[in-house]
Amino acid sequence: MGVPTPARRARLTFGALLAVPTLLLGGCTVSPPPAPQSTETTETTPPPPPKAPTQIIMAIDSIGPGFNPHLLSDQSPVNAAIASLVLPSSFRPVPDPTSPTGSRWELDTTLLESAEVTNENPFTVTYKIRPEAQWTDNAPIAADDYWYLWRQMVSQPGVVDPAGYDLITGVQSVEGGKQAVVTFSQPYPAWRELFNDILPAHIVKDIPGGFGAGLARAMPVTGGQFRVETIDPQRDEILLARNDRFWSVPAKPDLVLFRRGGAPAALADSIRNGDTQVAQVHGGAATFAQLSAIPDVRTARIVTPRVMQLTLRAQQPKLADPQVRKAILGLIDVDLLASVGAGDDNTVTLAQAQVRSPSDPGYVPTAPPAMTRDDALELLRDAGYVSEPVPPPDNTADDPPPDNGRERIVKDGVPLTIVLGVASNDPTSVAVANTAADQLRNVGIDASVLALDPVALYGDALVNNRVDAVVGWRQAGGDLATVLASRYGCRALEATPVATAVPGPATTTSQAPTTTTTTTPPATTTPTPTAPIPAPESGELVQAPSNITGICDRSIQPRIDAALDGTDDIADVIQAVEPRLWNMATVLPILQDTTIVAAGPSVQNVSLTGAVPVGIVGDAGDWTKTK
């Protein structure tokens, strides 16, 4: 083969250059897709619609006066229910007929890893909070919340039976706030009933109204299985939603709606049609029979955790004589007041003991026989009171007013006047107070009703003696020794400075604080003036009086103390002190609130026999809607 000439080499080189792009283009060409096998058009399946939230509707009478479970003025069945579902608790009540109150308190392991007595001298309880426990705003549930609740229960007037909190000398925060070390001035066997329905301290302390009034119509932050979505006072509705930030087992229902059930016929139709699944309402025999007749609907009657009382304030000079107090209470028809307090056609559960409530397993009526009107008026005459005709009003008309025979009871020319104080946000208590005043006016006592804001009623009105008596609810289902000490004890008579172990929550030390004892007033049987409570901003912790009767019986105080520290059996103590409490004639128990509960066939896991403090909603997180 010969060597190419220059012309031939040029032609070969040019041809090679033309071939390279052709090869490169051929190597980058994408293969065409396979031929379609069918000419039919493929339709895209739309995603399934979102699942509708599971909502369980519970019928109620009203949403109640407020949502702070620790205030006397806010006690209601709905408040107890809401608190148990949205607020964290150290312990939860479960039914136990062998206990003095019918409930046993078990550790809530969703909030606490443990809670135990870690020292006997001083008596100390250590609460270990789960690290993941948090409020719905992401703030941790911590020892600061325990500290805040203790301080409020000691210093605020009008709280629920605070004798246990009054024994605390310090709450210390350790382990970054996830341990609360609580020291007491003495042993307290009922410590498991403290620090339940815990409030978010970082929210409540700053909202308008604070602890005493800030939760009247709102629950902005919660820490339970549910959170409060909306509260509509006008429609009497509360909507709870599952708390997606809850760190333990989530609630099964997405939503629980508490709403007004309406008239018995409307409620029956709603349950019959499946619009309402659960109900807790007041009603009589007709309502109960109407609901019970609906196929597959379960019904029962349960008592709620509140008892209504009328309390006379014996430190008022006109009420210092026990015979006068006995006469006033003897002139009141308790059966009538109970009927008014129970509502139209509702079954009445009379309360006829000073310490125990009708729901307590050991309850027996201890009330003395009812006094006749003549006997009561005789007691007033023995105390120096007389009846005289009511002077006619100034009348310039020609015709004098008719003589209706009305008389008034006076002493030294001064009429006997009684001002009944009542919380203005509680229409039931207002109605009972008005009826009691009517009864007293009918016999010549100048009785009137003063409806006040709850903060003013239990604070300024008691301190400045603006009221002679208080009509309202007390909590039922709690520790009996604590009830006895809170309502009748000499230690609970006056505003008393509290010596505390630490000034506030500490977060850097793990050493338990040393304990100092609380200063207590001397026991007395004479009326005791109520001292003013220092302003909260003063920083001083002062125990507010919870015994609003104004007197105590020092002869039974050692038994009260022994019951509180567990060295004396509470049943024996109650048996010994009940006659003396009745003889003091300061507290007139009226009734324990009773409701009808019903559950329809479309909801499962609803127990109609829950523990008294929480009622039937204690297990609402497990309720399941079947259709």
Curated annotation (Swiss-Prot):
Domain of life: Bacteria
Signal peptide feature range: 1-27
Originating species: Mycolicibacterium smegmatis (strain ATCC 700084 / mc(2)155)
Pathway where it operates: Phospholipid metabolism; phosphatidylinositol metabolism
Pfam families recorded: SBP_bac_5
GO biological process: glycolipid biosynthetic process; peptide transport; phosphatidylinositol metabolic process; phospholipid biosynthetic process
Similarity field: Belongs to the bacterial solute-binding protein 5 family.
Function summary: May directly or indirectly regulate the accessibility of the key branch point intermediate, monoacyl phosphatidylinositol tetramannoside (AcPIM4), to the elongating alpha-1,6 mannosyltransferases which could regulate the lipoarabinomannans (LAMs) biosynthesis.
Keywords carried by this UniProt record: Lipid biosynthesis, Lipid metabolism, Phospholipid biosynthesis, Phospholipid metabolism, Signal, Virulence
Molecular function as annotated in GO: peptide transmembrane transporter activity
Low complexity biased stretches: 501-528
Name of this protein: Probable monoacyl phosphatidylinositol tetramannoside-binding protein LpqW
